[in-house]
Amino acid sequence: MPGIPTDTALYRRMLALGWVEATTEQVMHLDLSDFQYPEKMREKEREMAENGYFVDWYREGVQQGVDEMVESLNNSMWSEEIPPAAHGGMRLLVGLEGNTVAGFTGPVYPEPTGRGYFAGIAVGPGFQNHGLGSLLFYKLCQAEKDCGARYMSLFTGINNHAQNIYKSAGFETKRYFAVMIKEL
């Protein structure tokens, strides 16, 4: 469902006509020229490595379980894009427990507009609460910058706890969008 910018006359008119907000999304933006991989993440990497968790580029035949991890997320868009990207040699960052894929972000490449593309970021249900999401996201920002992207943008729900990771990496909310519904 498309969202309606909440700072527009259309949004106010729809409210007046009985439409209500089902959910609110925010668009967030980061100018990558300002991004620096922080020392606190290097420390986190060392701590996580001591517990067997790493982030690295996906390597076919070396790491295992990418298909199963993506399937466990129950997201049809990711199921259609991420396994083919991984098996097709695209640049995909993965969170690992040993050699088992525990999370992903990417594929990583700059779009012609200069925007750093990524389909999403997720950590599988059995691997959450170890810091992989934060580490994957910071590694993603650095990888996008390194491959020539000038900025990154994303949509996320206003109640999504991951927005705290995005904000800590320097992302700023630029606009809010309401997904509107109306009973007929």
Predicted ranges, named:
Residues 1-49, 178-182:
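Acyl-donor-binding surface of acyltransferase catalytic domains
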Residues 25, 39-77:
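Short amphipathic alpha-helix that is part of the acyltransferase structural core
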Residues 73-125:
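A conserved beta-strand-loop-helix scaffold within acyl/acetyltransferase catalytic domains
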Residues 137, 159-162, 184:
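Short glycine/proline-centered loop/turn elements that form peptide/ligand docking sites
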Residues 123, 129-142, 146, 164-168:
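Conserved acetyl-CoA-binding loop-helix of GNAT-fold acetyltransferases
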Residues 14, 166-167, 171:
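Conserved active-site tyrosine of GNAT-family acetyltransferases
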Residues 1-3, 144-155:
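Conserved GNAT acetyl-CoA-binding A-motif
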